[in-house]
C-alpha cells in the first residue's frame, strides 16, 4: 500500500513516509514504523456526574478520528478495544501507537528479544485489523525502560500532528497503584504521561519542536482525552456490540496470554460490571478531560468535565 492510503482521514496534505520494516531495535533508535490497513473512513458525549442508584448515563460523544497511545502491543486490546471498535463501526477512524514493541514481555530468559518483538508486532497488527484501525505505529522504544523524555514526546507529537485526532485515549498518568490490588506497570505510566504531555501543550504549540511545523506538520489541538485504567472513571462507553470483537482481538496475542479462556472470562466480567453501571451488557470506563469544545456542542454532562487551560 502506498502513501496515499496512509493519509486516509487526515486533515492535512503533508506527506508521510511509510515504514513497513519488521522490528530491528538498536540503542537510541527513533522514528515510528507505521503499518497502514485498508479499512474504514472517518464522526457526541453524554456524561452524567449525578449518582442515582449508582447508575450512570452512557457516554455518546464520538470523534471523527481518534488515536490510542499505549506502552506495549496488547495494551490497547486489554484497554479500549471495545470503545475503538464501537466508534469505528459508527464511522470514526482510529490510529494506534505502541511506544515499545514488547521485547521484554516474556518469562523465558533464553527468548530472543528481537524475535519476541517481531512476533508481538505481528500479533498487534492482526489485532488492529480485527478492531478496524486505519493503522498502527511502533516507536521502538526499549520495553521495560520507557521514559517520558523529549525524544518520545517529539515522536508522539509527530504522530498526533500527522493523524490529527479529535480524541486521544491513553492511560491515566495519576495511577501508580490500581485500587489496592496491583501496581501500574512503569511503561504504562511513562506512556500515559508522555501522551498527555504530547497532547498538551506540545502538539498544539507551533513553537514546540518547530522543525515539525516547518516540515508541514502544523500544530493540532486534540479536543478530548480519555484516560483508561483510571481509579477515577467518570464516563462509560457502551461496547455491548463490540465485546466479542475485543475478545477476538485479544486472541491475537498468543505470546502473552497463556490461559486464554480464564483471561477472557475475567475481561468479559469486567465489561459486564461496567455495563451494569449504565444499564447495558458491556461497557468500558474512562476519566474524561475536555480540552476544547464548540459552544453548540456543550451539554450539561460535558459541562461537568474538567476543562484544561487554553493555550
Positions of the model-derived regions?
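Extreme N-terminal basic, low-complexity initiation segments
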Residues: 1-15
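Short linear segments in intrinsically disordered or otherwise low-structure-confidence regions
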Residues: 9, 28-29
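Active-site rim/loop-helix segments in enzyme catalytic domains that contact anionic ligands
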Residues: 39, 46-164, 306
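Metal-dependent de-N-acetylase/amidase catalytic core
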Residues: 50-67, 149-311
